[in-house]
């Protein structure tokens, strides 16, 4: 579909995005109508999708979407969680009408219900999961575009874009690529400059993981505020008068104190030691007498 125009050729950065998101990885089962989009089969049984065919069908789908005069007449549907955020982002960027979540049966065929719509083009994320809108589209002659895996049935699908429609990153990247090509063909954005919208905004995120990340960020912010509060507290003001600092380089006069002279004693001239044996004997005699009197 790109023809000989170099502008429409797939760039190297686009190939790297496809490989990083796992868009080329199919399943272990293969539908006979999807054989034309298969490049090779791995030793573990996983089929590899030809990204060149993916890019050509992506451009064809973008041309079909641009051909609709009113962007609101394009309905984009995803009943699976992995594609709901991407569908809403695609609708916000291109002006399409999103249906994220459960598809109400009779939306395209039952004119009585309030949710009745008459779109001119239908784009679904998974032909197997979104079989109800595809079936109703066949009743009202509605052309359809679908992101198809290797095992996806192509019944009621007019334009099949071969890709991995199971992974959250692959589905988000395919919707991002489709939105970018639609805006480029409309002339809204230039091909010479990269689109400022990142593919991460189209990726599905688990609500539990988002809640855990927000909780961790809040705890980190509280800890940071407490840490900064300890260091940014105002220092106490000292109102006491500061003592004058003397010049330590000047010499300090120390008052002179006379040294007292003490006479030295001759320890060899001490009197002889008294006889300690007499005193205890006398004391013992006195105590004996006292005991005799008491008895």
From Swiss-Prot:
PROSITE patterns: RIBOSOMAL_S2_1, RIBOSOMAL_S2_2. Its main location: membrane. GO terms for molecular function: laminin binding; laminin receptor activity; structural constituent of ribosome. The modification Phosphoserine is found at residue 43. One of its GO terms (biological process) is ribosomal small subunit assembly. One of its GO terms (cellular component) is cytosolic small ribosomal subunit. The record marks 115-116, 133-134 as: Cleavage. PANTHER family: 40S RIBOSOMAL PROTEIN SA (PTHR11489). Belongs to the universal ribosomal protein uS2 family. This is Small ribosomal subunit protein uS2. It comes from Chlorocebus aethiops (Green monkey). The lineage of its organism: Eukaryota, Metazoa, Chordata, Craniata, Vertebrata. The gene is RPSA.
């Amino acid at each position: 579909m790109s023809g000989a125009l170099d502008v429409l050729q797939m760039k190297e950065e686009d190939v790297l995005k496809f490989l990083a998101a796992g868009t080329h990885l199919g399943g272990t089962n293969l539908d006979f109508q999807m054989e034309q989009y298969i490049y090779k089969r791995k030793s573990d049984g996983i089929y590899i999708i030809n990204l060149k065919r993916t890019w050509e069908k992506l451009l064809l789908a973008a041309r079909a979407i641009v051909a609709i005069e009113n962007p609101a007449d394009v309905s984009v549907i995803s009943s699976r969680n992995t594609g709901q955020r991407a569908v809403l982002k695609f609708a916000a960027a291109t002006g399409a009408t999103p249906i994220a979540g459960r598809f109400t049966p009779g939306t395209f065929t039952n004119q009585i219900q309030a949710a009745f719509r008459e779109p001119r083009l239908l784009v679904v994320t998974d032909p197997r999961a979104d079989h109800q809108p595809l079936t109703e589209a066949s009743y009202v002659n509605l052309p359809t575009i679908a992101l198809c895996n290797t095992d996806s049935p192509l019944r009621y699908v007019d334009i099949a874009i071969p890709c991995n429609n199971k992974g959250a990153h692959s589905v988000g990247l395919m919707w991002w690529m489709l939105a970018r090509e639609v805006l480029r063909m409309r002339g809204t954005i230039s091909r010479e400059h990269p689109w400022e919208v990142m593919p991460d905004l189209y990726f599905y995120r688990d609500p539990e993981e988002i809640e855990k990340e927000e909780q961790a960020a809040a705890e980190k912010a509280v800890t940071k505020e407490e840490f900064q509060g300890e260091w940014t507290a105002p220092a106490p003001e000292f109102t006491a008068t500061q003592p004058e600092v003397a010049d330590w380089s000047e010499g300090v006069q120390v008052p002179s104190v006379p040294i007292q002279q003490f006479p030295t004693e001759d320890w060899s001239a001490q009197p002889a030691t008294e006889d300690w044996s007499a005193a205890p004997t006398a004391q013992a005699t006195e105590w004996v007498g006292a005991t005799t009197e008491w008895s």
